[in-house]
């Protein structure tokens, strides 16, 4: 069965008023399944739900899930914002507002990098609203005892926010994945166009870092509170968030398992899309 999937036809906007937040969020809404999977993207310049997860949608939809991709505040077509406190909690608050607006009481959450940090923040604040968690390349802040911080990848990411050029984008993306030969000029140009189309997002991220360099707090002391079944996925060659962070999540979350992809960087769901999709479907269905 061929499933019609397009960004334009699934594009939606919602006004979110939750706590101190009052902003317009963009999201994509696909499928009509009884169970919903929410996908949260990472913090790279030009990121969006669609750009992060376009290789992972069809298997979930074919399996009967509804899929919601949220563009976090300050990214893509969502409203700009300066975050002076916890970005993880800000995104979790925005997600709660979106789920309330959509009438979704309980969802599975799949988060990549910043999206994983935000998924953990949401699960801690709203434990009864989480079915299962999938955390890729993130889930808690905190320093690595093995890798100098900030990591090589994060330095390049922050540099790209300050100087959004095609050369700086290529430098970051070449570290983002294990095999840079998979990156195309079309991908680079699409990402650059998305970055430059909302320059205020770039400026606001730099201002946010200046106001609070620790945008993503260390949830280590609270991980044991998470009761949701959790699948942790990491790339062994991740140069943005080192793999020991995944081991900390595994040790802290009681009902969790860890899958490590070899020859894989920070973008497991894109670099190893087919085995990743099988892994996630098996986890969600059993």
From Swiss-Prot:
Site (Transition state stabilizer): 113
This protein's pathway: Aromatic compound metabolism; 3-phenylpropanoate degradation
Protein origin, superkingdom: Bacteria
Claim: Iron is one of the keywords in the record: no
Pfam families associated with the record: Abhydrolase_1
Record bears the keyword Membrane: no
GO molecular function, one term: protein homodimerization activity
Family to which this protein belongs: Belongs to the AB hydrolase superfamily. MhpC family.
Role of this protein: Catalyzes the cleavage of the C5-C6 bond of 2-hydroxy-6-oxononadienedioate and 2-hydroxy-6-oxononatrienedioate, a dienol ring fission product of the bacterial meta-cleavage pathway for degradation of phenylpropionic acid.
Protein name per UniProt: 2-hydroxy-6-oxononadienedioate/2-hydroxy-6-oxononatrienedioate hydrolase 2
